[in-house]
């Protein structure tokens, strides 16, 4: 969110491309959510626009806001360099994937599809 604000752009995130820990979605469906996730979601609610499957909205958003999963590394790279970056990461034994794109949108906006 801070990267988007400082760059004056928004992002479109593809929820199906975002990896979750094994069992995380099942735990969320059972209501096993840390309190910090609700506080994070409340803090970012005005920056998030949901455009995905409405049946998946609540569980997906709360998982994206889970403070236990906030340690992942996010890299912004020009589209022309994406494949080279992913290949380099794979060669180094690091799992990488594209989860979204930067878009012209109000600064800090996160569109989740």
Locations of regions flagged by a protein language model:
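Glycine-/charge-enriched secondary-structure boundary and capping motifs
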Residues: 1-113
